[in-house]
């Protein structure tokens, strides 16, 4: 269950690419991946910018394993109050532990130096659906 943590710890750097979202439309994404505490945690600093909307998403996330060994994302961003914990339910799929709206984040590394980061949510009790997704490549 910690494969993603190990892969990201071995591939720190700045990732840049493009994304798209139902509300945001097309955007340019930048995610800085930093290994901390000897690879026991990863920080992800994510920004999304577009010409029409400017800076539209700022997020600071910590990926780490819980005491039980399950991966967790601890997310703070402009759209959420405080810090929200997302717990991995299957490889790369993190469900919100608590919150007003059903939500999840899907993080994958389909190949070396490539990272995808998707936000899924629903404004009602329906199953979350993909709302925003970035595909970025390591550039530095």
Model-identified regions with their sequence ranges:
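Tryptophan-anchored aromatic micro-motifs
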Residues: 9-23
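Short beta-strand segments that buttress and anchor functional surface loops
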Residues: 16-20, 44-50, 73-76, 93-99, ...
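N-terminal leader/targeting helix
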Residues: 19-52
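Short, surface-exposed coil-to-beta transition loops
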Residues: 26-30, 55-60, 80-83, 100-104, ...
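A short, structured loop/turn motif at beta-sheet edges
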Residues: 34-40, 64-70, 87-91, 108-113, ...
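Helix-adjacent hinge/juxtasegments
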Residues: 49-85
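Short aromatic loop motif centered on NTY/YTY
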Residues: 80-116, 122
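Edge beta-strand at a domain terminus
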Residues: 121-140
